[in-house]
UniProtKB/Swiss-Prot annotation:
<feature type="compositionally biased region" description="Basic residues">
    <location>
        <begin position="551"/>
        <end position="568"/>
    </location>
</feature>
<dbReference type="GO" id="GO:0042797">
    <property type="term" value="P:tRNA transcription by RNA polymerase III"/>
</dbReference>
<keyword id="KW-0175">Coiled coil</keyword>
<dbReference type="GO" id="GO:0051082">
    <property type="term" value="F:unfolded protein binding"/>
</dbReference>
<dbReference type="GO" id="GO:0042791">
    <property type="term" value="P:5S class rRNA transcription by RNA polymerase III"/>
</dbReference>
<comment type="function">
    <text>Involved in gene expression controlled by TOR kinase and nutrient signaling. May also be involved in positioning the proximal bud pole signal.</text>
</comment>
<feature type="region of interest" description="Disordered">
    <location>
        <begin position="152"/>
        <end position="197"/>
    </location>
</feature>
<feature type="compositionally biased region" description="Basic and acidic residues">
    <location>
        <begin position="306"/>
        <end position="318"/>
    </location>
</feature>
<dbReference type="GO" id="GO:0016272">
    <property type="term" value="C:prefoldin complex"/>
</dbReference>
<dbReference type="GO" id="GO:1990115">
    <property type="term" value="P:RNA polymerase III assembly"/>
</dbReference>
<feature type="compositionally biased region" description="Basic and acidic residues">
    <location>
        <begin position="169"/>
        <end position="197"/>
    </location>
</feature>
<keyword id="KW-0597">Phosphoprotein</keyword>
<dbReference type="Pfam" id="PF02996">
    <property type="entry name" value="Prefoldin"/>
</dbReference>
<keyword id="KW-0963">Cytoplasm</keyword>
<comment type="similarity">
    <text>Belongs to the prefoldin subunit alpha family.</text>
</comment>
<dbReference type="Pfam" id="PF12927">
    <property type="entry name" value="DUF3835"/>
</dbReference>
<feature type="region of interest" description="Disordered">
    <location>
        <begin position="421"/>
        <end position="458"/>
    </location>
</feature>
Length: 796
């Protein structure tokens, strides 16, 4: 208490010294302000002498003509008179506020010191405490005798010190308390409201002291728990002797068949706890009332003991086996001499307890969870917490394979057996051919057969009449293939003779020439021309483009082939008429597909064609033909000339000059809505082939390149104003440019200082320590833009 009072006194002294210093400084600045006011008046009057050489007042220097304010470290700045007066006024205001705060602190320190002094002088209060102790429950010694089962046999309550009777204590206290109360009443009238508050605070402190006071029980004669245990062990050794653990045998059957009622013991424990509560915090005042209350408790205990005794006698009448087996007197004497030992039974019964671990986990949740989640989790948990033996899990732990799995020893045999069976099934299985391919093959055979029949008939008739002609034509068989290709040659000659030079290749043309009887008849009738053909063979072989077989033909768009000189030949105009009519008829019949596929079977067909047809075709290819006196040219295509004229290119494309690089069968061409029916039928037939093609040729996806770089903005060029045209002025020092640079620099510094202030402010650290969460316990995320905006709004 003395140390606390001394610290309060030192604090009070420091506060008073600071207040006195501030009051002195306040008077000093008031004097400075008055001098500044007079200094202004003197200047207004025009007096330049002033106050001599000038004066120094700490932070302010007043000279004859100027006023200076201190910046610290002996640096001064010139100020005007008005600025100096405002500076002094601010200083005076701050000093007055500080003096008020010190006055409040000094008053509080004085009150605290008065309270401490009043507590030291509280002798009368201690006497009141001694008198008030009698109102509380006196300390007493309670002794109870217990039987073997823990029941109370007898109890006694004795006070530690003799308590005077309540009547005598009241008589002794009344004369002493009377004058004190009168004196206190007079003092209360003279005390102020604050002193009354001090008295209330003292009463509260007194109550705390009364509760904390130590008990008056004699601790030397009180038994501790260790003493009680030691005493009980000694008593057991005297009664039973020292028993070894090997000699102890428990009769578990008797223990299971016995009926123990534990509820009574729990009730007694509860009653004992209630009694202890009553003893510690008694509601009944006075010693006599307390003693009568304890007597009633003893009476109730005696009644309860008698009831328990009667109940035990009724239970003893029943035939129950004792827990410990009875032994003879000799065995008891031997056991007393031996040491105590503890043994274990040979067989035990194990009772399984339900595992509630998963259920407890589900119940321990710190946050509210939606109902649908709990239902799902409980359903799964109930399945997992079943007590049934999981044989599959046990088998997996042992490494046992499932019934469907095959052992590694027999896997190779099974794989070989499956491979042999697959090969056998493939050999026995018929090769599947789509109906679409069958139809195509059948159409080819039919067209070839009809074509052969017609050609053989026409040729046989002519061969019988003109045998010598056949002998001259047999020599050049390969030319037939080239003659077969040139359908458009003769077809276009009928329409316009000059156009024949631009057209070379069209496969179906010569097939029609071979089929027509009049054509062969006309060629065979003119023996001199055929002889001319035979004589001019070397010249044609060297220059004609028809000498190459069909498979070696290379005609590409916009590529000029080798040119050949035109051959003159007398030619009958009836041939052109027959060829032109038949050409258009064949296009209507739809034999284009067959004629386009002739390139594959060309070698086979040449062997089967009659020799007369081959000779006639060779003669037409090697020699020129004449219509009257005018020669018919063999057509040559000038691809470079076609490239310059779009109309000619379109016409050549429609005639099929560019079809040499196309596939044999383009497939179904969809030109109308009705064509989709045929297309869908073919899709159904070729479903397996389409699937295989899609698996073999997977589409290649092109990955888009991602470019995270900055996107270039448009560059805006500003024209220089007229003021920049002056060479003497620098562009960087122009007022507009300077203002722009100042604004940019100010913006940058403002952002830097704001970020630095946010990082260094303690509020930012405290906000970072707390993480907001929702009702389910998930963290709530806020954007940085939103948090910065809220933070800037919250700033003053």
């Amino acid at each position: 208490m003395d140390l606390l009072a001394a610290s309060v006194e030192s604090t009070l002294k420091n506060l008073q010294d600071k207040r006195n210093f501030l009051s002195e400084q306040r008077e000093h600045y008031i004097d400075i302000r008055s001098r500044l006011v007079r200094f202004i008046n003197d200047n207004d009057d025009g007096e330049e002498e002033g106050e001599g050489q000038g004066m120094v007042f700490g932070d302010i220097i007043i000279s004859t003509s100027k006023i200076y304010l201190s910046l610290g470290y002996e640096y001064y700045v010139e100020k005007t008179k008005e600025e100096a007066i405002t500076f002094v006024d601010d200083k005076l205001k701050l000093m007055e506020d500080a003096i008020e705060q010190f006055n409040l602190k000094i008053e509080e320190a004085k009150k605290t010191l008065d309270n401490l002094n009043h507590m030291e002088d509280g002798n009368g209060i201690e006497e009141d405490e001694a008198n008030n102790d009698e109102d509380f429950l006196p300390s007493m010694e309670i002794r109870e005798e217990l039987d073997d089962e823990g029941n109370v046999i007898s109890s006694s309550v004795t006070p530690t010190t003799k308590q005077p009777s309540q009547s005598n204590s009241k008589k002794e206290q009344t004369p002493a308390v009377g004058p004190k109360e009168k004196g206190l009443a007079k003092e209360k009238k003279s005390k102020s409201f604050e002193e009354n508050l001090k008295g209330k605070l003292l009463k509260r402190n007194d109550e705390v002291k009364k509760k904390v006071q130590p008990s008056k029980v004699d601790t030397e004669n009180v038994y501790t728990f260790a003493d009680l245990v030691q005493q009980m062990d000694q008593q057991d050794e005297l009664e039973d002797g020292y028993i070894e653990t090997d000699e102890i045998n428990y009769d578990y059957d008797a223990f299971e068949n016995s009926n123990f009622k534990v509820n009574d013991n729990y009730e007694e424990d509860d009653e004992d706890e209630d009694e202890e509560e009553y003893l510690n915090h008694s509601i009944i005042p006075g010693f006599e009332a307390q003693s009568s209350f304890l007597q009633q408790i003893q009476r109730l205990r005696a009644q309860k003991q008698s009831q328990d005794h009667e109940r035990e006698e009724g239970d003893v009448n029943k035939s129950l086996k004792p827990i410990l087996k009875k032994s003879s007197f000799a065995e008891n004497s031997d056991k007393k001499q031996k040491k105590k030992q503890v043994g274990f039974a040979s067989s035990l019964e194990i009772h399984e307890v339900e595992n509630l671990k998963e259920e407890n986990k589900r119940q321990m949740q710190s946050f509210a969870v939606p109902m649908y989640e709990t239902q799902e989790s409980t359903g799964i948990a109930n399945k997992m917490t079943s007590d049934e033996f999981d044989g599959d899990l046990f088998a997996k732990m042992l490494g046992v394979q499932e019934a469907d799995e095959v052992h590694e020893k027999y896997k190779e045999e099974l794989i070989n057996q499956e491979r042999l069976e697959g090969e056998a099934s493939r050999s026995n299985r018929r090769t599947r051919v789509s109906r679409f391919r069958k139809d195509r093959a059948s159409k080819k055979e039919n067209t070839l057969s009809t074509f052969k029949q017609e050609t053989t008939r026409s040729v046989e008739n002519e061969v019988v009449e003109k045998e010598p002609v056949v002998g001259d034509i047999i020599e050049k068989e390969p030319v037939v293939g080239d003659v077969i290709e040139k359908e458009p040659v003769v077809g276009d000659v009928i329409e316009k003779e000059p156009a024949v030079t631009d057209i070379v290749e069209r496969e179906p043309a010569v097939n029609d020439i071979v089929e027509r009887k009049p054509v062969v008849g006309d060629i065979i009738e003119k023996e001199p021309t055929i002889n001319d053909i035979v004589e001019k063979e070397p010249e044609i072989n060297s220059k004609s483009e028809f000498e190459t077989p069909f498979k070696k033909k290379k005609l590409k768009s916009l590529q000029k082939p080798r040119s050949s000189k035109s051959m003159k030949k007398k030619f009958d105009p009836k041939i052109l008429e027959n060829i032109s009519d038949d050409d258009y008829d064949d296009d209507d019949d739809g034999n284009k597909k067959l004629l386009s596929n002739k390139s594959k079977n060309n070698t086979d067909e040449q062997d089967k064609f009659p020799s007369k047809i081959q000779e006639v075709s060779r003669s037409m290819a090697k020699t020129g033909a004449t219509v009257g006196s005018e020669p018919v040219r063999i057509t040559n295509v000038d691809y470079h000339a076609l490239g310059g004229n779009l109309d000619d290119m379109v016409k050549a494309y429609s005639l099929g000059l560019y079809d040499d690089d196309l596939e044999e069968d383009p497939g179904t061409i969809v030109e109308k809505l009705e064509d989709f029916k045929e297309y869908n039928k073919q899709v159904e037939l070729l479903r397996d082939e389409i699937r295989d093609f899609q698996l073999e040729n997977k589409p290649v996806t092109m990955e888009e390149e991602e470019n995270d770089g900055n996107v270039m903005n448009d560059i805006i060029e500003h024209e220089f104003p007229e003021s920049y045209t002056n060479d003497e002025d620098e562009v960087a020092l122009h007022p507009g440019r300077l203002q722009e640079e100042v604004a940019i620099e100010y913006r940058r510094l403002k952002e830097a200082t704001a970020s630095k202030w946010q990082s260094s402010s303690p509020a930012a650290h405290t906000e970072g320590e707390l993480e907001p969460i929702d009702k389910f316990g998930n963290p709530v995320k806020t954007s940085r833009f939103r948090s910065q905006r809220l933070h800037m709004d919250s700033k003053p």
